[in-house]
């Protein structure tokens, strides 16, 4: 052992200031040699370690939540939370971008077009399919829409407070942003049909391969059945026939019956009044301000126009009886008065304005002016349906479905009291109506009287639909549902008799009385 160790170690004093025994020297030498050997082995093994296989990308199995499903009414309330949730750090943006890439580069659609295998230490480059690239574009479009929504919200409330008074330029700017968002939402829906819908060409190419395999399997089964002399069912020959994939592919092969609606001939022999309306439409074309075939549950626009002609004739027939006209006038006054009372509003100014409107309509000398004024607003016929139901009520409901963003910004602001919200909302509605009233061509015409009534009803309806009062909201929604149900009844073959004007008019009046009674019962609860 002394031959192995250096001479200086044997002397025991040249390296250490104290004497070391031989056993201690052997232990120290062994430890040093072991550590050196382990370091050499670890470096060698690390160099020979094979590269780790790339991690498989996550497969995208579900449809993403579309941002365009939100209604335009939620832009102001949601945009703030989006802005706070979105981080500007490089790490956050990198992670978000990698998530989108992993989702888009998964095994979707018809598969990859080509793969380039590189050597160890270099990345694997995968050529993306058309569907994957399209989905990445959809994600980018969703990000763009988020920023545009935040821009709209920031313009309305630059300092966190609602901007109640805006100039004409600001309103025009916000309107253009909303139009831009609407076009972006439409583009989002179209891209979903191209890249996510099961009926897309991208999915049909995949299904064509499955169909070819199924046809080959069917041919083999037929040959087996002819040899054995037994009749085998489709399910018996294919053990995977009831699987989820086969069921999904079978659903894609089922024809959409709605595509053949235009080729189905419906017999209208039992509806003589409707038949005459169809002939009238073929000869003269029924004029219409807005086609509401979907709202009235009509299968085609032609059916809606023919039924619209019947409805106009029915109301003209009903108003020949002064008693019917007086009943409709009294019913409208009672319903609107009850609404104001349920909202704790004073009804005096409303009743004065309502009586002025009734007296104005009863004067036959005013009707040429009324017709001229309404024709400028594209009202095609001077009937109760066209003026009251279509032009006033249905358009008002449409405005309530898409209120101005300034209104939603005030109502949905959690830092404002309910009293201040209601006052601000009423002031905003009054200012808009007064501005419209000043621009009227006929200062004392029909629209002027209508705006007087709207100054009392519109703030209440807006507060009822968007305010925090649950009872008032329930009443307003019930009022709208009953009116829409009444319109659906008079346009229905099952609820109304399109046989003669007399019978159809009787059904229309009966439906109106039923809905008025329902509203009265609801308001009295």
Curated annotation (Swiss-Prot):
Subcellular location(s) per record: Mitochondrion outer membrane
Pfam family, one: Miga
Biased composition (Basic residues): 47-67
Membrane topology reported for the UniProt record: Single-pass membrane protein
Molecular function in Gene Ontology: phosphatidylinositol 3-kinase activator activity
Entry's Gene Ontology BP terms: mitochondrial fusion; mitochondrion organization; positive regulation of macroautophagy; positive regulation of mitophagy
Key words of the record: Membrane, Mitochondrion, Mitochondrion outer membrane, Transmembrane, Transmembrane helix
Transmembrane segments: 26-45
Effect of residue 34 to D: In mitoguardian; progressive neurodegeneration in the eye caused by mitochondrial defects. Abolishes localization to the mitochondrion
Region (Disordered): 47-73, 210-239
Coarse class of the protein's main subcellular location: mitochondrion
Any GO CC annotation of this UniProt entry: mitochondrion
Entry superkingdom: Eukaryota
InterPro entries, sorted: Miga
Biased composition (Acidic residues): 211-220
Subunit text: Interacts with zuc.
Function, in words: Regulator of mitochondrial fusion required to maintain neuronal homeostasis.
Family statement: Belongs to the mitoguardin family.
Designated name of the protein: Mitoguardin
Highest classification ranks of the organism: Eukaryota, Metazoa, Ecdysozoa, Arthropoda, Hexapoda
């Amino acid at each position: 052992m002394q031959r192995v160790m250096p001479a200086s170690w044997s002397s025991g004093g040249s390296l250490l200031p104290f004497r070391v025994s031989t056993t201690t020297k052997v232990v120290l030498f062994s430890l040093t040699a072991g550590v050196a050997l382990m370091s050499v082995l670890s470096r060698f093994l690390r160099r020979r370690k094979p590269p780790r296989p790339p991690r498989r990308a996550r497969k995208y199995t579900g449809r993403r939540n579309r941002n365009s499903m939100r209604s335009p009414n939620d832009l102001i309330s949601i945009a703030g939370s989006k802005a706070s949730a979105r981080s500007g750090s490089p790490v956050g943006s990198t992670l978000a971008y990698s998530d989108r890439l992993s989702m888009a580069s998964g095994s979707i659609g018809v598969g990859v077009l080509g793969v380039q295998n590189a050597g160890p230490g270099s990345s694997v480059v995968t050529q993306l399919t058309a569907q994957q690239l399209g989905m990445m574009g959809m994600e980018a479009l969703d990000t763009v829409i988020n920023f545009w929504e935040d821009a709209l919200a920031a313009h309305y409330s630059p300092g966190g407070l609602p901007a109640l008074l805006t100039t004409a330029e600001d309103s025009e700017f916000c309107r253009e942003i909303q139009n831009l968002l609407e076009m972006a939402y439409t583009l989002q829906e179209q891209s979903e049909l191209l890249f996510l819908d099961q009926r897309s060409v991208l999915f049909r190419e995949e299904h064509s391969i499955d169909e070819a395999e199924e046809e080959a399997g069917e041919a083999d089964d037929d040959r087996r059945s002819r040899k054995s002399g037994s009749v085998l069912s489709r399910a018996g020959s294919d053990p995977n026939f009831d699987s989820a994939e086969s069921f999904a592919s079978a659903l894609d092969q089922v024809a959409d019956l709605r595509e053949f609606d235009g080729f189905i001939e419906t017999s209208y022999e039992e509806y003589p009044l409707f038949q005459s309306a169809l002939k009238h439409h073929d000869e003269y074309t029924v004029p219409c301000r807005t086609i509401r075939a979907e709202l009235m549950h009509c299968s085609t626009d032609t059916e809606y126009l023919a039924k619209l002609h019947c409805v106009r004739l029915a109301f003209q027939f009903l108003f020949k009886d002064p008693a019917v006209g007086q009943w409709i006038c009294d019913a409208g006054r009672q319903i609107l008065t009850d609404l104001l009372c349920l909202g704790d509003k004073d009804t005096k100014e409303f009743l004065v304005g309502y009586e002025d409107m009734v007296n104005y309509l009863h004067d036959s000398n005013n009707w040429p002016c009324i017709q001229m004024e309404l024709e400028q607003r594209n009202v095609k016929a001077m009937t109760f349906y066209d003026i009251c139901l279509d032009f006033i009520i249905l358009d008002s409901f449409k405005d309530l479905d898409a209120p101005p963003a300034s209104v939603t910004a005030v109502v949905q602001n959690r830092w404002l009291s309910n009293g201040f919200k209601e006052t601000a909302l009423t002031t905003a509605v009054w200012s808009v109506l007064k501005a419209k009233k000043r621009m009227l061509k006929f200062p004392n015409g029909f629209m002027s009287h209508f705006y007087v009534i709207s100054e009392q009803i519109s703030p209440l309806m807006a507060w009822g639909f968007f305010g925090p009062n649950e009872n008032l909201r329930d009443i307003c929604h019930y009022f709208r549902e009953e009116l829409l149900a009444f319109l659906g009844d008079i346009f229905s073959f099952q609820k109304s008799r399109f046989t003669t004007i007399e019978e159809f008019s009787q059904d229309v009046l009966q439906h109106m009385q039923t809905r008025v009674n329902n509203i009265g019962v609801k308001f009295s609860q």
